[in-house]
Amino acid sequence: MNIGIVCYPTYGGSGVVATELGKSLAAKGHKIHFITYNRPIRLDLFSENIFYHEVRTPSYPLFEFTPYESALASTMVDVARFHKLDLFHVHYAIPHASVAYMAKQILRDYQLNVPVITTLHGTDITLVGRDKGYEPVVRFSINQSDGVTSVSHFLSDSTYQAFDIQKDIEVIPNFIDLSRFRRQNKQHFKQMIARNDEKLLIHTSNFRKVKRIPDVIKTFSLIRKDVNAKLLMVGDGPERKPAETLCRELGLCDDIMFLGSQNAVEEIYAVGDLFLIPSASESFGLSALEALACGVPVISSNAGGLVEVVQDGQNGFTSDVGDVEKMAKDSLSLLTNQTRWQQFSDHAAKYALNFSKELIVPLYEEYYRKILDASHITTTI
C-alpha cells in the first residue's frame, strides 16, 4: 500500500506513535509518505520505503497567522496525485481530520477517491476538542472520516460521550518496539548518576499542566524523606521553569536532574527503579508502557487510559489524581522491598509483550484493508 501519514512531528505521544507506525509499515514493504511541517523526531533512519514531504506555509503581510491548514491540504493533494496514495492516515483530529476531509474533496475533482482514517490520541478529544470553538469541526471531521481508530477504550468512550459520533471507532492500542524498549544492564551508567547507590525515579513528558509536574516533585519529596533517591526529569515544556522553581523552594536541587528532551529514553529507563506519571488525564500513557517494557514498575494516577496500561498491584500502583501521599507510600512499598520490586519488574516486562509492534501493527494493516474494501464498494455503487 501507498500510505500518506499526517502527524505532529514532535516528542508528543501522537507524533511518536505515528512515526513508529510508519517505520514499521515501511519495514513490511509499504510505501510511507510523511506529510508534516518538520521532519518527525523519531524519523531517524533511511529506508527506500519512507518519504518525507515538508509542508511549507507562505508568509504574507496580509496574514496575521500563516494558513497552515490550506498549505497542508494542498500538499496532501499533491502527494496523493503524484505518488498514487491508497489512503491517508491522519493522527490527532485537530486540524488534521478536517484538513484531510478538504483534501479528499479536492481530489474528487481529479477523479480520485483517497479514503481517510483518523486516529484519535487524547487531548484532541478530551481537552482541545471540547472547546466550543472547535467542537463542530471535530464532530464533523470525525463523522466524515472513512475510518476512525482510538488508542484506548477510555478515549473511544470519551469521544462518544463528548460528541455526536455516528462512526464505529476501532480501538487499536499503542505499541512499542521491544527490541529497543527492553531490560538492559546499564550499571555503569547508573553508577555515574547514583554514586551513593541512590534509587532512581524517572518522569518523562512534554511538561504541560495536564501532566501535573508539581505532583511528581511532591511525591519525590515525600519518598526522599525515607529513601536515598534521585529524580530524573526528562522532557521540556511550559511547566519546566515552575518545576525548577519548586525544586529550589523544597531544597531538592541536588537530588533532581532536569535532562531536557532526549531521544534515547530507553537508556534512561534502563537505570530506573520507578516511573512516575501522575497525570490529570492520559488517553493511554505511552511513556508508562515504555517504562514497563524496560522492567520499571509504574506509579501513576488512575486517570483515563492509564488503567489499561498500569495493572494496580501487579506492575505498578494507581492512585486518585493528586493523591501524592498514596503515590509516595506505594513507591516506598517497592523501593524498600527488593523481592517485591523484582516481582513487579518481572510482571511489567511480561505485560508489555501484549503491546509489541509485531502484534499491533498487523491490526492497522487489517483495518486499512477493511476501509479500502468498503471505499471501493462505495465508489463503484
Segment roles from a protein language model:
Residues 182-195, 377:
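A short helix/loop element that forms part of the nucleotide-sugar donor recognition site in Leloir-type
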Residues 7-11, 23-68:
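N-terminal strand-loop element at the rim of the active site
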Residues 154, 175:
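Carbohydrate-associated surface elements
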Residues 261, 280:
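Aromatic "clamp/platform" in nucleotide-sugar-dependent glycosyltransferases that forms part
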Residues 326, 333, 340-354, 363-366:
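A short, well-ordered alpha-helix in the C-terminal region of glycosyltransferases
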Residues 297-300, 310:
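Short hydrophobic beta-strand element within catalytic cores of glycosyltransferases
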Residues 194-211, 217-220:
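Conserved donor-binding/catalytic core segment of Leloir-type glycosyltransferases
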Residues 312-313, 317-324, 333-338:
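Conserved acidic donor-binding segment of nucleotide-sugar-dependent glycosyltransferases
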